[in-house]
Curated annotation (Swiss-Prot):
Subunit record text: Interacts with DsbI.
Superkingdom as given in the UniProt entry: Bacteria
Gene that produces this protein: dsbL
Annotated Gene3D superfamilies: Glutaredoxin
Keywords, sorted A to Z: Disulfide bond, Periplasm, Redox-active center, Signal
This protein's name: Thiol:disulfide interchange protein DsbL
Pfam families (alphabetical): DSBA (PF01323)
Locations listed in the record: Periplasm
Function: Involved in disulfide-bond formation. Acts by transferring its disulfide bond to other proteins. Part of a redox system composed of DsbI and DsbL that mediates formation of an essential disulfide bond in AssT.
Annotated InterPro entries: DSBA-like_thioredoxin_dom (IPR001853), DsbA/DsbL (IPR023205), DsbL (IPR028588), Thiol_disulfide_DsbA (IPR050824), Thioredoxin-like_sf (IPR036249), Thioredoxin_domain (IPR013766)
Molecular function terms from GO: protein-disulfide reductase activity
Single GO cellular component term: periplasmic space
Similarity section: Belongs to the thioredoxin family. DsbL subfamily.
Length: 222
């Protein structure tokens, strides 16, 4: 067997190994595709959290085309959990309260947050459309009742029903949990996607729905 032929085989083996490497090694890098939070979100194992605000244009865009498909692709590993950011927008507090109530209503009814019947989804997209498409500002913070009415009407809920549900312990617990959203949002703004409460995805480096889902799957099993 000639030395030249042996060398040719060796090169072929090395090339084959190099080509196989991307399929066996991680395609994602800490510091480039994601970061580890110094202060993890508590009680968030096996979740994909999205920190968002009704007043965030990119949150609206992601919710129209990205969030649902990604959540669906990773549903076998993580549960999607929205965290509304109370500190953004003139009516962040009112939005958080109705979102927490509608999430509880959807859960009790066994309705997915992505379902067209979801009260959470109806209120969210009513505010998104009013704020970003119609440029509605509800008197710039001076008319919380009008802002709330937009969400309530979309969700098909009365003011009395909302006020009663807001007092429920589960709703108050959700609002308390959402306070952790502020520290996460300070890092790169919103939307902010967090896997298992500790891995923050760098949204600027998301290439596609499939690659984002792949990253979530990898982080969920770390």
């Amino acid at each position: 067997m000639s030395a030249k032929w042996i060398n040719s085989i060796f090169k072929s083996v090395v090339l084959t190994a190099a080509l196989a490497l991307p399929f066996t090694a991680s395609a994602f890098t800490e510091g480039t595709d994601y970061m580890v939070l110094e202060k993890p979100i508590p009680d968030a194992d096996k979740t994909l959290i999205k920190v968002f605000s009704y007043a965030c244009p990119f949150c609206y865009k992601y919710d129209k085309a990205v969030t649902g498909p990604v959540a669906d692709k990773v549903a076998d590993l993580v549960t999607f959990v929205p965290f509304h950011l109370e500190t953004k927008g003139e009516y962040g507090k009112q939005a958080s309260e109705l979102f927490a109530v509608t999430m509880a209503k959807d859960k009790a009814a066994g309705v997915s947050l992505f379902d067209e019947k979801s009260q959470f989804k109806k209120a969210k997209f009513a505010w998104y459309a009013a704020y970003h498409d119609k440029k509605e500002r509800w008197s710039d913070g001076k008319d919380p009742a009008a802002f709330l009415k937009t969400g309530l009407d979309a969700a098909g809920m009365s003011q009395a029903e909302f006020e009663a549900a807001l007092k429920e312990p589960a709703v108050q617990q959700t609002l308390q949990k959402w306070k952790a959203a502020y520290e996460v949002a300070k890092i790169q703004g919103v939307p902010a996607y967090v896997v298992n409460g500790k891995y923050l995805i760098y949204t600027k480096n998301i290439k596609s729905i499939d690659s984002m889902a792949q990253l979530v799957r990898e982080l969920a099993t770390k």
